[in-house]
Amino acid sequence: MTPVVALVGRPNVGKSTLFNRLTRTRDALVADFPGLTRDRKYGHANIAGYDFIVIDTGGIDGTEEGVEEKMAEQSLLAIEEADVVLFLVDARAGLVPADIGIAQYLRQREKTTVVVANKTDGIDADSHCAEFYQLGLGEVEQIAAAQGRGVTQLIDQVLAPLGEQLNADQAVENEENSANEEADEWDTDFDFENEDDTALLDEALEEETEESIEDKNIKIAIVGRPNVGKSTLTNRILGEERVVVYDMPGTTRDSIYIPMERDGQQYTIIDTAGVRKRGKVNLAVEKFSVIKTLQAIQDANVVLLTIDAREGISDQDLSLLGFILNAGRSLVIVVNKWDGLSQDIKDQVKSELDRRLDFIDFARVHFISALHGSGVGNLFDSVKEAYACATQKTSTSMLTRILRMAADEHQPPLVNGRRVKLKYAHPGGYNPPIIVIHGNQVEKLADSYKRYLSNYFRKSLKIIGSPIRIQFQEGNNPFAGKKNKLTPNQLRKRKRLMKFIKKSKK
């Protein structure tokens, strides 16, 4: 299962800043005053080759009343959910009584805890951090979350031991970086116009990713808000009353893994607990269910996002959808309870879906009734299609041809008067498909052009139901850092020009 890392500490020590840095988002509000984060926030992160779920919490200072007391409860529950706790302290403010109280609680819970001294930029970090050793929680890691300094080393140190404890299941190698690094070596030695050379590169890259798509057992996670019919859909798919169904939100508390076979294909159905608004999550057991659901998404190959047709799509559905896309999982949207609706209401629901889900037009949408079984059988065609698209193998020569066709139809923009040059593309991984594009000044490409390339690759490769990740790799400049040596003739010409310039100034 995916490790869970909780960020806890006093208010305004930089927990939300670190959360945004780890998840590479701006999901957590950040401001220079305490108490801004009032609830737990979950995010997906991939740092130093490790996939994990990170939880941002409100601050604890021991004087909570009213809403602050609820914030403290959220933080304590996050500690219970986590595999590792990052206890953030303020290096500039030094050790305060609230830090000592939090440390005492963490020792009592016997949680794996790492003390992280934040805001170490611009100060003598070693001397400022020395007093935090009094907390008795081991080494003190020094970071500057706002600048990103020390964050990668922190995660590597924190999750490496955890990966060993969990049989290294969570210590997933970062395929993207390894593919990029290897491609740099090929860049200088091989001709990408030559099919024999590109075949060699494809063979090398295929060895890295072959194991990841070798397993033909397709894992399907059924997720959504409470009481949208996830367990009913699971039972309809299985043809038996395998999971408890009741017309009350929150019946399913844990993720249930159920193996099955259909038309010779092995599947694992994952029925999950409903994910509702954080403000409505009250029971401790339900809070654990949210984590289990997010971990099930990470573990799945294809996710069925189930929506109640009678309630429409909510902000919580969109939040869950964002987590699915960030995790890179294939997606099929299931609109349940479609039976019994009038045609006018059906038209309204379809219009609302088109409006709010226009950014994921690559996903299939199915209108079903899990209770009566209508439309359920067609789901497997979309599941197999999405899985096949997510794991299909493409060659370097094909991706490079598509890249050049895209550049011919719409040239890359000028940057500082120079045209961005896109040299070649190669596969960087599967599930989801990763395309690595090499070129010059590619880091300066506008987001609009990156979206154009993503859509062009999707259309050309006919990828349905799976997100695409495009990585940009700057080409090696053999002359970078080297001083230009002039020939004797060039030196004499330079001297004559300098004399001419000096005379013209007089």
UniProtKB/Swiss-Prot annotation:
PROSITE patterns registered for this protein in UniProt: G_ENGA
Domain KH-like: residue ranges: 392-476
Molecular-function GO terms, alphabetical: ATP hydrolysis activity; GTP binding; ribosome binding
Binding site for GTP 2: 224-231, 271-275, 336-339
Annotated binding of GTP 1, by residue: 9-16, 56-60, 118-121
SMART domains the record matches: AAA
Family designation: Belongs to the TRAFAC class TrmE-Era-EngA-EngB-Septin-like GTPase superfamily. EngA (Der) GTPase family.
Subunit text: Associates with the 50S ribosomal subunit.
Physiological role: GTPase that plays an essential role in the late steps of ribosome biogenesis.
Listed name of the protein: GTPase Der
Biological classification of the source: Bacteria, Pseudomonadati, Pseudomonadota, Gammaproteobacteria, Pasteurellales
Gene name of the encoded protein: der
